[in-house]
Swiss-Prot record:
Residues 299-475, 484-665 form the Laminin G-like domain. Pfam families: EGF, EGF_CA, FXa_inhibition, Gla, Laminin_G_1. Glycans are attached at residues 499, 509. Residues 117-155, 157-200, 201-242, 243-283 form the EGF-like domain. GO terms for biological process: blood coagulation; fibrinolysis; liver development; negative regulation of coagulation; positive regulation of phagocytosis; positive regulation of phosphatidylinositol 3-kinase/protein kinase B signal transduction; response to axon injury; response to lipopolysaccharide. Keywords: Blood coagulation, Calcium, Cleavage on pair of basic residues, Disulfide bond, EGF-like domain, Fibrinolysis, Gamma-carboxyglutamic acid, Glycoprotein, Hemostasis, Hydroxylation, Repeat, Secreted, Signal, Zymogen. This is Vitamin K-dependent protein S. The modification 4-carboxyglutamate is found at residues 47-48, 55, 57, 60-61, 66-67, 70, 73, 77. The modification (3R)-3-hydroxyaspartate is found at residue 136. Residues 42-87 form the Gla domain. It comes from Rattus norvegicus (Rat). The gene is Pros1. Residues 88-116 are annotated as: Thrombin-sensitive. It comes from the Eukaryota.
């Protein structure tokens, strides 16, 4: 059988050689139908007893699938091998196309092609990057993966950075996955430690001391910052701090003043505005204590103007007329002119005034000149009826219809001319400059009121109509003793603060008795040119029911007292003593004064200014920029001022606003309760 089989195969080979080339690539129909049929060959008995051998069975001879199974002795390998075996036969048969050889991986010969078939790892089925080795199996293979790879062919990288059992791969910052592995990295500004997992911040400020130039270098985790003081912004191009112009950003509601490192907002206090709590917007200054500002047109105010007369009347009466004046009078003032009468040629005159609270009469006629002061003190703030009447040989003065003085005289006070007595009468003040003609000089200003006047026995003829038509000539219905600042003007004084006997050189000792009607305003200010080197001011506190007392040196607070209730019926006392070495602020109700940490520098600035000329203002500041001092609103309310032991009299001011009352202040308005 073996010999016949061999001969048969040789015959097939010979037949193949003589077949046309067009048929060499294909099996016959009959042969092809038998390829997948398992037929056991008729081998010799000795050959059948041997174990199957690939070389002997399928290379030296042609084998069918059954014979191939004898080699592998299992179906999986046989099923895997035999189709590929047929491919090798087709590729290496004589005259086969080169394309067939290429399909068999270009093995050099049939033996190489067939021997390679049983090795499942050839060609390599595993991923080249991920496999460590390939293990051949029965019609199968097993890829052994390198660390960091997975999959049946080691084709999938393991992302160690997402391993739930080792969060972030154990990296303190960044975990970077790589094919088959991973590594830790640090963010910019950090350096890797030797354990290759943890990161440490890099201190750029120490490594590069000049990295910020003139700014301050501040190390932060992973980076650094170049810091500038408040009000400055870092400029990386010049490595320096540049001032921020906050005013260019429309920061303030009204006036904004930029300065190196900051800015300040100001509101026009003279128009009734103050800086709000946000230090940017402006709001109206509220009334904190309502005063009784009601007036009566029948009450003539004698000190409506700073200088000059309040009212002028001229009488032309029969020559038998004698001078007479009767009126009700109210004042707290101690000195001033009530009325002045004179003839048309100014040769004869009569003065009725108040000195030290008592009635004083001065007169001059063609025969004599006299002055007399007497009677009771009447500057008590109540209404007193005063009458002055010329008799035949004397002048009679009565208060409340009781004679207090009787002045002898020769002749008439005023000489008739052409059958008429022409007389001019001036209320409160002197016409022209006649002070030098007086027997004894007197303050022409008088803060007082008159009513019910009867002049030359003509009643109120001529005067009533004038008084009724002018509101500023009317008196408040009720007043108290004190000086009144209406919140619309100031008074100026010239005060020398230098004390040659004092080692401190200059001294400002101020005592104020105040009853404000608004909680914001300048009480006292020293002005030098366009600057305000010193100011004592009130500001409404945040509570809305109390006030803060502030001492300003130029534009900064040197000392302040917080949350004091000053808007009440009872006046409050305030003291401020300051020289080049120290500052003391005091009130009887609060002792917890807050002083500036920069006080000594502020005092040095003030000391330099006080060596020059300063003007003293009460009730506000003059018409300078309202950025000259943080508070520029006029003070409103009652206030009496003592500076360096001298009680200031507004009648002695260099100038004062017409509406400032020197010796009277409106009473607090009484709130009527409804029951």
């Amino acid at each position: 059988m073996r010999v016949l089989s061999v001969r048969f195969r040789v015959l097939l080979a010979c037949l193949a050689l003589v077949l046309p080339n067009s048929e060499t690539n294909f099996l016959s129909k009959e042969r092809a139908s038998q390829v997948l049929v398992r037929k056991r060959r008729a081998n010799t008995l000795l050959e059948e007893t041997k174990k199957g051998n690939l070389e002997r069975e399928c290379i030296e001879e042609l084998c069918n699938k059954e014979e191939a199974r004898e080699v592998f002795e299992n179906n999986p390998e046989t099923d895997y091998f035999y189709p590929k075996y047929l491919g090798c036969l087709g590729a290496f048969r004589v005259g086969a196309f080169s394309a067939a050889r290429q399909s068999a991986n270009a093995y050099p010969d049939l033996r190489s092609c067939v021997n390679a078939i049983p090795d499942q790892c050839d060609p390599m089925p595993c991923n080249e990057d991920g496999y460590l080795s390939c293990k051949d199996g029965q019609g199968a293979f097993t890829c052994i993966c390198k660390p960091g790879w997975q999959g049946d062919k080691c084709q999938f990288d393991i992302n160690e950075c997402k391993d739930p059992s080792n969060i972030n791969g154990g990296c303190s910052q960044t975990c970077d996955n790589t094919p088959g592995s991973y590594h830790c990295s640090c963010k910019i500004g950090f350096a890797m430690l030797t354990n290759k997992k943890d990161c440490k911040d890099v201190d750029e400020c120490s490594l590069k001391p000049s990295v910020c130039g003139t700014a301050v270098c501040k190390n932060i985790p992973g980076d650094f910052e170049c810091e500038c003081p408040n009000g400055y912004r870092y400029d990386p191009s010049s490595k320096s701090c540049k001032d921020v112009d906050e005013c260019s950003e429309n920061t303030c509601a009204q006036l904004c003043v930029n300065y190196p490192g900051g800015y300040s907002c100001y509101c026009d206090g003279k128009k009734g505005f103050k800086l709000a709590q946000d230090q940017r917007s402006c709001e109206g200054i509220p009334v904190c204590l309502s005063l009784d500002l009601d007036k009566n047109y029948e009450l003539l105010y004698l000190a409506e103007q700073f200088a000059g007369v309040v009212l002028y009347l001229k009488f032309r009466l029969p020559d038998i007329t004698r001078f007479s004046a009767e009126f009700d009078f109210r004042t707290y003032d101690s000195e001033g002119i009530i009325l002045y009468a004179e003839s048309l040629d100014h040769s004869n005159w009569l003065l009725i005034a108040l000195r030290e609270g008592k009635i004083e009469v001065q007169f001059k006629n063609e025969f004599s000149t006299q002055i007399t002061t007497g009677g009771n003190v009447i500057n008590n703030g109540i209404w007193n009826m005063v009458s002055v009447e010329e008799l035949d040989d004397s002048v009679s003065i009565k208060i409340a219809k009781e004679a207090v003085m009787n002045i002898n005289k020769l002749g008439s006070l005023f000489k008739p001319t052409d059958g008429f007595l022409d007389t001019k009468i001036y209320f409160a003040g002197l016409p022209r400059k006649v002070e030098s003609a007086l027997i004894k000089p007197i303050n022409p200003r008088l803060d007082g009121c008159i009513r019910g006047w009867n002049l030359m026995k003509q009643g109120a003829l001529g005067a009533k109509e004038i008084v009724e038509g002018k509101q500023n000539k009317h008196c408040f219905l009720t007043v108290e003793k004190g000086s009144y600042y209406p919140g619309s003007g100031i008074a100026q004084f010239s005060i020398d603060y230098n004390n040659v006997t004092n080692a401190e050189g200059w001294q400002i000792n101020v005592t104020l008795n105040i009853r404000p009607s608004t909680g914001t305003g300048v009480m006292l200010a020293l002005v030098s040119g366009d600057t305000v080197p010193f100011a004592l001011s009130l500001v409404d506190s945040g509570s809305g029911t109390s006030q803060d007392i502030l001492v300003f040196v130029e534009n900064s607070v040197a000392a302040h007292l917080e949350a004091i209730t000053l808007c009440s019926e009872q006046p409050s006392q305030l003291k401020c003593n300051i020289n080049r070495n120290g500052l003391e602020l005091w009130t009887p109700v609060r002792k917890d004064v807050i002083y500036s940490k920069d006080l000594q520098r502020q005092l040095a600035i003030l000391d330099k200014t006080m060596k020059g000329t300063v003007a003293t203002y009460l009730g506000g500041v003059p018409d300078i920029s309202f950025s000259a001092t943080p508070v520029n609103a006029f003070y409103s309310g009652c206030m009496e001022v003592n500076i360096n032991g001298v009680q200031l009299d507004l009648d002695e001011a260099i100038s004062k606003h017409n509406d400032i009352r020197a010796h009277s202040c409106p009473s607090v308005r009484k709130i009527q309760k409804n029951f």
